[in-house]
Amino acid sequence: MDVTYDGTKREFATDRGTLRYHEAGDGPPLILLHGSGIGVSGWRNYRGNLEVFAKHFHCYLLEFPGFGVSDPVDGHPVITAASSVIRFMDALGIESAAMIGNSMGGVVGVNVAMRFPDRVRRLVTIGGVGPNIFSQNPREGTRLLQEFAHAPSREKL
């Protein structure tokens, strides 16, 4: 199975620009949603895992608009990314899929699951969502961190 950059790279035109992605493997669909940051892309986030995932799933590494090699669009990156996931699924005829979201991709995955629950079979987030323990009133989060730091254990993780 060819899981190289050039061997997996695909693209298609939408009414909001060209979306690019990487595709590999057979099996149920798995959409991998990347994080944000300078130079980030689906390929950079997941290239090390693609070969293993592709043995069990039909993998899609979507490059969100304005990231990787996809065309930029106007609007907030998380909002445009979430709508691009649905456009992507519609264009490829994917009724529903498992999703893994890293960082911003986790937030995008949660947004997609909340807006279109029938389109998301399963969702795994990696550092993507959760309560902010450092809010203006962080008592509970601070208490949990202090308890863990005082006597770290597997159970307290």
Short names for language-model regions:
Residues 70, 103, 127:
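Catalytic nucleophile serine of serine hydrolases
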Residues 15-69:
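Conserved HGGG/HGGXW glycine-rich cap/lid loop of the alpha/beta-hydrolase fold
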Residues 1-18:
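N-terminal cap/lid segment of alpha/beta-hydrolase-fold proteins
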Residues 107-115, 120-154:
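Flexible "cap/lid" loop of the alpha/beta hydrolase fold
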Residues 14-15, 51, 61-100:
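Active-site loop/oxyanion-hole signature of alpha/beta-hydrolase fold enzymes
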Residues 34-36, 97, 101-106:
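Conserved alpha/beta-hydrolase "nucleophile elbow" surrounding the catalytic nucleophile
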Residues 29, 56-58, 93-98, 119-122:
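Structural signature of beta-strand start/N-cap positions in the alpha/beta core
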Residues 42-45, 70-76, 134-137:
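Conserved catalytic-core motifs of eukaryotic protein kinase domains, centered on the activation segment
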